[in-house]
Amino acid sequence: MTELLNFSFYQLLVFVHIILFVLWLGADVGVFMLGQHFRKREKYDLPQRLVLLQLLVNLDMTPRTAWALMVPLTITMVDAGGWWDVPGWGVALSWAVGAVWLWLVWDAHIHDQTERAARDRKIEFVLKIGLTAFYLGLGILSLSQGEPLMPVWLATKALMFGLIFAAAIMIDVAFKPVGPQLGKLIAEGSSDETEIPLRKTMDTTRIWVWIVYLLLLATAFLGNMKPF
């Protein structure tokens, strides 16, 4: 039994990191596909498309949850792996931030279409901007000064994680008009007047979605291959 459990805490964290990556990217592809089908007004009637949209919103909680958990996990990993001697309070703070973010995401989802959800999302938006600045700053500082993160692949990975944050924020920004546009579609029915603006918004959002996918794959490549 001892031999079967012969693995380190760092190895366990790496395993969890891989699981979260799979859930993040895999579920997000599912969200993308549901969005693709929602766009097909010639194939589905409006009630069917609204069901697809509800499934999309529910499934989207998986990548959002994985994203929030990635923050404390990455900090804990670099500390446990000996890549960066993070003080205990820093690790604890990262888990506190992750817990708050997770609560905001799920509270907004449970109380959707309420002032409480709107408040949660505003706080989450500010939090994500702060985390974007943190990871971008960490990556740039490490690449320019050679610390606190080294080797180069790890510093680059931190920088790219910050870019993922930035692109994901742009997804939310680009998607924001969907609420009123969808409300108009439901109230007035399907027509070029209600469908075309919604389609344009979704097309713009898809650009940022593809950018996130590419950055996720590039980050995974760096973590696995460690090319430099």
Regions found by a protein language model. Give the residues of each.
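Polytopic transmembrane helical bundles with strong interfacial aromatic enrichment
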Residues: T2-F228
